[in-house]
Amino acid sequence: MTEHNVRNFNINFGPQHPAAHGVLRLVLELDGEIVERVDPHIGLLHRGTEKLIETKTYLQAVPYFDRLDYVAPMNQEHAYALAVERLLGIEIPIRGQLIRVLYSEIGRILSHLLNVTTQAMDVGALTPPLWGFEEREKLMVFYERASGSRMHAAYIRPGGVHQDLPEKLVQDIGDWCDPFLKALDDIDNLLTGNRIFKQRNVDIGVVSLEDCWAWGFSGVMVRGSGAAWDLRRAQPYECYSDLEFDIPIGKNGDNYDRYLIRMIEMRQSVRIMKQCVNRLLSDAKTGPFSSIDGKVVPPKRGEMKRSMEALIHHFKLYTEGYHVPAGEVYAAVEAPKGEFGVYLVSDGSNKPYRCKIRAPGYAHLQAMDFMCRGHQLADVAAVLGSLDIVFGEVDR
């Protein structure tokens, strides 16, 4: 009887794998079908964003944030704008805050819709993505009507938002809400009670709450394990403290709980959007949508035609940019994927001295090995989908 040396089998997952959500390369060590080790290789989409921001003025840095988590672009701009505003010490008028919150929640729905439906596709359900993309298309049109661009909006800027929303657009967003909930019910009916979907997700990728904190998780990952931690509640920014919404939490910390939380969060986002729309059409119908500080926010076209002072301000803002007082600040928002933070250091000039970006997906991806060990090879795609990783923000 000859002895056989049994050794583990190494395979590459990606970087052009349909379930890899971008340019992820995982080196998997398998013992038969069982995953022994997962090695994520990142950096294939590295563009040097943080370094590039150091060479741009504070306004020119805004578009870089759209290109991080490109599924929900405005949520990143929001964090950056908050950081700059804290350094400048300026307040945003209530209409501007409501517009920002409205579009942040649209971004949350954009992200969750894509994640829930593509994760379903990864485990074999082919209908939800088609239904989800139909709704996302309508939201992309709202992005386009506000900023002129479907994805890279550069709409939320330090000092407020780029331009005011027409009343018709606000009404259309309000009209979109209820039909969307019906479409969400359809997706819900297809997946939530589906036997195959549950077999692929229940008790897969379980993380305890202690492990969540140890790995630096945030957002849905933490809430799926039972902590009601949401920055919109825990550290309210903008006008979230005046809005009513619930925070769903899971109790098993598995893929299925995270899926359920994303489904409920979309309904809560619609609830927030309805409140914003009502206020934008009633008490906040008129009024400034961005700060009235002429040194930060460009003047109106009409003023520029009449006032030399306004013309000079406009020219200086778009050439040299405004100078931000020296200091450092960390501003975080509850992005769809978790806590998206911007640590901004200013040296008093017109360019950031350092802009550190804290992407939630980066912390989640490093736990891939911890979460997949002992699972089947087929579960790797299910866990990866449940983490909700977009490579723009991981590699930056």
UniProtKB/Swiss-Prot annotation:
The keyword Membrane applies. NDH-1 shuttles electrons from NADH, via FMN and iron-sulfur (Fe-S) centers, to quinones in the respiratory chain. The immediate electron acceptor for the enzyme in this species is believed to be ubiquinone. Couples the redox reaction to proton translocation (for every two electrons transferred, four hydrogen ions are translocated across the cytoplasmic membrane), and thus conserves the redox energy in a proton gradient. InterPro entries: NADH_Q_OxRdtase_suD, NADH_UbQ_OxRdtase_49kDa_CS, NDH1_su_D/H, NiFe-Hase_large. It is found in: Cell inner membrane. Its EC number is 7.1.1.-. It comes from the Bacteria. It is an enzyme of class 7 (translocase). This is NADH-quinone oxidoreductase subunit D 1. One of its GO terms (molecular function) is NAD binding. It catalyses: a quinone + NADH + 5 H(+)(in) = a quinol + NAD(+) + 4 H(+)(out). GO terms for cellular component: plasma membrane. Its main location: membrane. NCBIfam families: NuoD, PRK06075.1. Belongs to the complex I 49 kDa subunit family. Keywords: Cell inner membrane, Cell membrane, Membrane, NAD, Quinone, Translocase, Transport, Ubiquinone. It comes from Rhizobium etli (strain CIAT 652).
